[in-house]
A protein has these predicted regions:
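Hydrophobic residues in alpha-helical membrane-spanning segments
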Residues: 26, 84, 311-314, 357
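Proline-centered flexible-loop/turn and helix-kink motifs
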Residues: 78, 83, 307-311, 362
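A conserved hydrophobic secondary-structure block that centers on an alpha-helix together
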Residues: 261, 270, 347, 356-364
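Short, small/polar-rich motifs associated with maturation and membrane association
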Residues: 1-268, 273-274, 279-286, 349-351
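Short coil/turn segments at secondary-structure junctions
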Residues: 23, 62, 218, 337-341, ...
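Surface-exposed loop/interface segments of Gram-negative outer-membrane beta-barrel transport/assembly proteins
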Residues: 32, 168-213, 255-256, 265, ...
Length: 410
């Protein structure tokens, strides 16, 4: 119970130059630690702790405290909720994050992003796209060295621990969560139209290449992007076991033509008590498939859209299929030509983990944890001859695997 208790013999005094001083009793607000709610238990990584025994800086964001707007990455659910957490999204505004800072810049040569943990599986920012935001039960943020020390140098920039939802006892239930939205450019640069460009050139006596059209290239490359999120979950269980399975889909269309993202996610959690509660077994799987299509040259596309000759047409040559270009300005190209470039990235991610908890004594447990993670990324680019002098094509892929295991007595 919260109580306001006056401190004996304590006065808070205010004295202003040339004015009469004033004093009043000083009050402090206290709370009995033993009266903290039972849900104040934090998952700090390899172990669990409560407000009574955690000495470092730890913050927990539950589902009720998360942001509710359309989000593409789980960390957006806690943006603005955690002091000191800075999130920088990628230029295309899709699911990927460019950087995340929790404890500021801690290294000039190594990475400064915090360590990401999902249900005990260690990873980086790329792992976040495999977790659908509504599948998350809570975030626990570790900032202090006393709590991140358990992860060694990997936790030097802080730790963000994500716990996904689990099944509950009862009949099988189905839950659906969906949302829709649109995105568009808020405003454009105020540039000369084709008619204004001709008029100004005539007044100044300039010699210009006039194709006879009036094209707003900023508007020509834009589109109204549709956004949609869908997630369906099945969960249930009994006294000794429970399960939860969910499937998610996100579709994002950018405000520029040919920009977009499709993301498919899957998550499964199962738990089983064995030998009359002597052993607790937990199994989990989560994974995703993401397809991105982005601009090949973001800076040149937007710069050209603002600076390109507005008297040029907004369609290619009917005979050759090529776009009209300005040959005297190497950094200004027809922005619509860049819409023909195919720049794709496909990423697949899969992770499985298992945890066995042996309840040896009342206050002694042995926990055995293991995880396997696999990811693959494929990049592909194609620049047709109508855009690039001799055309260009590229394809590359990379993959990674990781095994993690630990044994702990607690």
């Amino acid at each position: 119970m919260d109580k306001m208790q006056p401190i004996s013999q304590a006065l808070y005094s205010l004295l202003f130059l040339g004015c009469m001083g004033a004093g009043f009793p000083l009050y402090v607000q206290g709370q009995n630690v033993d009266e903290l709610p039972p849900d104040s238990i934090y998952n700090i990584g390899y172990a669990r702790g409560s407000l009574k025994n955690i000495s470092g800086s730890v913050e927990q964001i539950t589902e009720k405290q998360m942001n509710r707007e359309l989000i593409t990455n789980p960390l957006e659910a806690i943006q603005g909720r955690v002091p000191g957490l800075t999130i920088l999204k990628s230029n295309n505004g899709m699911a990927a994050l460019e950087s995340v800072r929790l404890r500021g810049t801690t290294s000039l040569t190594s990475g400064n992003d915090p360590l990401i943990i999902v249900d005990g599986v260690l990873g980086d920012l790329t792992m976040l796209t495999s977790v659908y935001p509504t599948d998350i039960e809570s975030f626990t943020i570790l900032k202090d060295a006393s709590e991140t020390a358990q992860y060694g140098s990997r936790g030097a920039s802080g730790v963000i621990n994500i716990v996904t939802k689990k099944g509950r006892a009862g009949k099988t239930r189905v839950n659906y969560n969906g949302s829709f939205g649109v995105s568009h450019a808020y405003r454009r640069l105020d540039m000369l139209s084709g008619a204004e460009y001709r008029k100004l050139a005539a007044e100044r006596g300039w010699s210009i290449l006039d194709k006879g059209y009036d094209t707003d290239f900023q508007k020509a490359i834009e589109q109204t992007g549709l956004q949609q999120n869908h997630n369906i979950a099945f969960y249930g269980g009994g006294e000794a076991s429970n399960y939860r399975v969910s499937l998610g889909f996100q579709n994002r269309e950018g405000v520029i033509q040919n920009e977009g993202m499709k993301l498919f996610t899957a998550n499964m959690n199962m738990s089983q008590k064995m030998l009359d509660g002597l052993i607790d077994c937990e199994l989990g799987l989560f994974g995703s498939m993401k397809r991105d299509r982005t601009l090949f040259d973001l800076q040149k596309t937007f710069y050209s859209a603002a600076a390109f000759n507005p008297t040029f047409p907004d369609f290619p040559d009917p005979e050759t299929g090529s776009w009209d270009q300005i040959t005297t300005a190497s950094q200004i190209t027809n922005p619509l030509a860049w819409m023909d470039v195919d720049n794709r990235e496909e990423t697949s991610y899969f992770s499985s983990h298992a945890r066995l908890t042996f309840n040896l004594l009342k206050d002694l447990k042995m926990v055995l944890f293991g995880s396997y993670t696999y990811s693959t990324t494929e990049n592909a680019q194609f620049l047709p001859t109508t855009v690039w002098a001799n055309g260009q094509a590229y394809r590359g892929n990379r993959k990674s695997e990781a095994l993690l295991g630990n044994l702990m007595l607690t």
